[in-house]
Amino acid sequence: LGLSLDTNKFLIKKLLQQHGVPVPNYQLFNTPGDYLNPSLRFPLISKLNAIHGSVEITADAVSETEKHLRERLRYLIRTYRQPVLVEEFIVGREITAILLEGMNKKVYLAEKVFAHPEGKYVYLTFEDQWLSPGESAFRYVRYDDPLLKEYVKKAFEVTNMYDYGKFDVRLDQSGRYFFIDTNCNPAFGPKELDVALSVILDLYGVSFYEILKRLILNTVRDAIGKERLPLPGDRESEADDEALVDVEPAF
């Protein structure tokens, strides 16, 4: 279910909202001429509903007027032939959260420190994320807040994710969190490939090797959990249980 939800940002926003996870005010547009909910407050940011990876998140993604928003919607819907999610742009800091399962659910938080924070609207564009070398656009620093960790765990559960997930969160000037992106299948690889998951966990001393061990442990536990319950004297099932214990590292 988690993967099927991953290509519908609107549905994920609705699920999070219904379960008490804070999100910006939002609206889904199927056509450029759809009625604009008057409760939405500018500035507004437009995102493709079914595509991740910051595709079309450009310097022109934020609209201050309805005229500009309609032009943006017309371009995105006609080019990509899919609905567009429009939400209130949250001015403030941005935190990325990674949840990794092992023996339990562990949340790792990191703030994005932008190299050029002087702009009117500071956010990560497609170019920043994929075309800028190293830390020229931003870098991660450790961040901690028990409240945000609880929100992340709840978001992970209500969207039915498994193994790992990535969440982007904005923190406004009043100290309120808003979940702006949820991804159950983010880029995966070692930190040398500049992958957020590994870069952030490396800040906490968790290597890519350790990440792989935890994921393998999850897979083994899931596989054994789906087998029939062991019968008394069933040596094959007992051997499977012993094998599971043998592969469990101390996290």
Locations of regions flagged by a protein language model:
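Residue-level marker of alpha-helix boundaries and capping positions
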Residues: G2-L3, S63, Y143, F188
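Active-site nucleotide/adenylate-binding loops and adjacent lid/helix of ATP-dependent enzymes
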Residues: L3-L85, V91-G92, K149
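Short, structured loop/turn "capping" segments at alpha-beta junctions
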Residues: V23-P24, Q82-V84, K105-Y108, Y162-D163, ...
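Short beta-strand elements
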Residues: L44, E101, K112-F114, N183-P186
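Short connector loops/turns at beta-strand edges and beta->alpha or beta->beta junctions
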Residues: N49-I51, L131, N185-A187
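Phosphate-binding site of ATP-dependent enzymes
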Residues: E64-E150, L171-F178
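ATP-dependent carboxylate activation and anion-phosphoryl transfer catalytic cores
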Residues: R142-F251
